[in-house]
Design a protein with these regions (language model features):
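A conserved helix-loop-strand patch within extracytoplasmic ligand-binding domains
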Residues: 66-69, 75-127
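Short, structured active-site "lid" loops
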Residues: 35-61
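Small-molecule-sensing regulatory modules
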Residues: 1-40, 122, 126-298
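Short, Asp-centered acidic motifs that coordinate Mg2+ and/or phosphate
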Residues: 59-63, 149-150
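Short glycine-rich, flexible loops that bind phosphorylated cofactors or substrates
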Residues: 70-71, 160
Length: 298
């Protein structure tokens, strides 16, 4: 997945600027650890090694799934580009071509995301949401081998590795809000390098940048990590519309907020919706001790 993402950005840079880009592989803790992400620091574990390589001068650019990127600033590093966002929706891959409504009672659904598990349980409280790790091919194999009845993954990730045909249902944001930044890529470079920043302006999509700015502003204001059960999705060109939700991990409580603002007001839009959610009691849900996903036997 990481190589596919990097190649996507490299090809875009070459097509738009004529500059050739070499892909340099970097192994992260998130790639090698078999522990659940919530146990080893959340999806930010995919970011640290890349940033270290960037600061050490081993690479000039680092490409991340934007939803993995911590919201706080990183010393010496700049978020220099957000290319056009891919499809942000979540997708189900289930046995025998089944949609969510077709699955048997108590069906086993694999997901390592508290956000996905919570929204699945809100849709169907009888499901068994089981924790999974490994790359997308490993997860898909657990379905074809019969270990799981289905898995929920990001549509964009499946598309990048050529597995769209395996999808049996795509969840609209009204059914399952994506993670903040889902479907978008982030390109970081060392701060204080104007030539690199100027180069990356060629691949930045301003509408995508505004949308993810609003979503990440909300996440930061809620003081929640990227593994928290929070969904957010903003879209629009001149005028942004955004929906957000905070949920209990068992799906029994979901707090929602929505609003709009001009693209230039993206950051404040995220703050405003976060404030609305906090007034509704979101901090209680974010701060509730969470049982491991696999223990939600309902």
């Amino acid at each position: 997945m990481a190589v596919a993402q990097s190649r996507q950005v490299a090809d875009m840079i070459t097509a738009r600027t004529g500059r050739q880009v070499e892909i340099v592989g970097v192994t992260t803790l998130g790639d090698v650890s078999k522990a659940q992400l919530t146990q080893i620091g959340g999806t930010g574990v995919f970011v640290s090694a890349l940033r270290e390589a960037l600061l050490a001068g081993e690479v000039d650019l680092a490409v991340h799934s934007l939803k993995d990127l911590p919201t706080g600033p990183a010393a010496g590093i700049a978020l220099a580009a957000v290319p056009p966002r891919d499809d942000p929706r979540d997708a189900l891959v289930a046995r025998d071509g089944a949609k969510l409504a077709d699955l048997p009672r108590g069906a086993r659904i694999g997901t390592g995301s508290p956000r996905r598990a919570a929204q699945l349980l809100a849709l169907r409280g009888d499901l068994r949401c089981l924790p999974i790790r490994g790359n997308a091919n490993t997860r898909l194999g657990q379905v074809s081998d019969g270990e799981l009845d289905g898995v929920v993954l990001a549509y964009a990730g499946l598309a990048r590795i050529g597995h769209v045909n395996a999808i049996t249902q795509v969840f609209e944001p009204e059914e399952m809000l994506p993670a903040p930044g889902q479907g978008a890529l982030a390109v970081e470079c060392r701060d204080g390098e104007p030539e690199l920043k100027a180069l990356l302006e060629a691949v930045t999509d301003q509408a995508s940048m505004a949308a993810v700015t609003a979503e990440r502003s909300l996440l930061e204001a809620l003081e929640a990590g990227c593994s928290a059960p929070i969904g957010a999705y903003a879209a629009g060109t001149e005028q942004l519309r955004m929906r957000a939700a905070v949920m209990s991990t068992d799906g029994s409580r979901v707090l929602r907020a929505h609003g709009g603002a001009p693209g230039a007001g993206a950051w404040q839009l995220g703050r405003d919706l976060a404030a609305e959610l906090l007034r509704s009691g979101a901090s209680d849900l974010i701060g509730v001790p969470r049982a491991p996903i696999g223990q939600q036997e309902r």
